[in-house]
């Protein structure tokens, strides 16, 4: 049986490397999108471990956290952070929203987002025993 949890975590590691590369190149909107992806895939790893099945094909981080066993364990700061990441997924793909979102991003803000994303991913890996 394939390691479904490992599959999602491997994707997280690949996306983290990409997010760091994008930040170095000051591709801030794309970096923020990848941070959303990392959080999403981290939560999907938890769901895969919990259910033994493929996670739902949704992108809402709060809904994914609720379907996992981590929602009740999220600090207010982490919950707020997941909410902050929300707009970087779907909205970042549409031209009408891209410019508005891009205006809110600075290198300093993106450095913080990347750091918090890495911390969240690490926290999930610890919870999963990885």
Name each region found by the language model.
Residues 1-130:
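Terminal alpha-helical segments
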